[in-house]
Amino acid sequence: MIQTIDFHVPELEMMKVYPKTLYYLGKIELLKRPKISIVGTRHPINYTKIYTQELARKLSLAGVCIVSGGAQGVDALAHQAAGVSNTIMVAVTYNNKLEFTKINFNGFFTAC
């Protein structure tokens, strides 16, 4: 079920338009765990693919949540390698809907 998180960040008030509500799906308790962001190109070379998958897998096994935008390429590889249940996706969805449907999601997803 999609739920909302109401939040207030004073620094955002200087902007004309900013999100006042975040929508999320999944395990909110993942936000309390150690996190690292893995993002990168949508068209990685083979070396980058291998390195991203190995890094995400090892960090996930160590209890670190992988935070990424969920886009195709490096972002999606990181989520897949982390086993998805230990990942957090932060996204403003547009053209990456297909990537989300490819992943058997069991972690935490938020969008504004």
Which residue stretches match the model-derived regions?
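Glycine-biased, small-residue-rich flexible motifs in mid-sequence functional cores and linkers
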Residues: I2-C112
